[in-house]
């Protein structure tokens, strides 16, 4: 249908998230009819459009570090795209960065890592932060026998930690600096 409406000199540009497998059949059909050009996240785009700084934080470097860690822990298909951060061009505020992380980055990481918060902590550098107020994801040791009655030591795979999102960290520029 799309190909029939295009004149010889026109191009059809489509983007897609390669991690989204819900459209696999449609994707296969489109791949047979069109050329694909891979476009991975590119922090230089943020630098070129001046969307790479919030206060004295190098947002492009933060994106690179997050994506390096995601690639190591998962794969390159689940890296965070630079497009999430392009809004910083018009509003280079901490509040805008906070919104990007709270509404886009954290939910994607939760989905990608199936809510394995320890891996999310690694991606965000929380595992190396000594100040809990700077951690995006907090962890608290859980003692099963304090929660359940009876003998729980024999039960396999009980969690040893409970995780929570630390809303305070999102409004502190140092939380982002310590990702690096």
Would you name each region that the model predicts?
Residues 21-26, 45-49:
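Switch/connector loops and helix/strand junctions flanking conserved nucleotide-binding motifs
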Residues 121-180:
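C-terminal engagement/docking regions of AAA+ P-loop ATPases
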Residues 25-43:
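A short helix-turn-beta junction within AAA+ P-loop NTPase domains corresponding to the substrate/partner-engaging
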Residues 4, 27-29, 69-77, 154-155:
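A general structural signal for short secondary-structure junctions and capping/turn motifs
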Residues 14-20, 40-42:
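A short beta-strand-to-loop transition that corresponds to the Sensor-1 phosphate-sensing loop
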């Amino acid at each position: 249908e799309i190909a029939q409406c295009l004149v010889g000199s026109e191009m059809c540009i489509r983007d897609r998230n390669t991690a989204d497998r819900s459209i696999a059949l449609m994707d296969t059909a489109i791949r047979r009819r069109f050329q694909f050009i891979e476009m991975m996240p590119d922090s230089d785009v943020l630098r070129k459009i001046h969307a790479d700084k919030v206060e004295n934080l190098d947002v492009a470097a933060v994106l690179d570090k997050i994506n390096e860690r995601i690639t190591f822990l998962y794969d390159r298909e689940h890296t965070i795209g630079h497009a999430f951060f392009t809004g910083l061009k018009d509003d280079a505020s901490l509040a805008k960065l906070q919104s990007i992380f709270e509404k886009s980055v954290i939910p994607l990481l939760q989905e990608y890592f199936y809510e394995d918060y320890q891996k999310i902590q690694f991606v965000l550098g929380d595992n190396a932060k000594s100040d809990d107020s700077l951690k995006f994801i907090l962890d608290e040791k859980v003692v099963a026998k304090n929660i359940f009655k009876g003998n729980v030591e024999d039960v396999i795979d009980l969690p040893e930690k409970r995780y929570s999102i630390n809303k305070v960290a999102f409004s502190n520029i140092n939380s982002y600096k310590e990702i690096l």
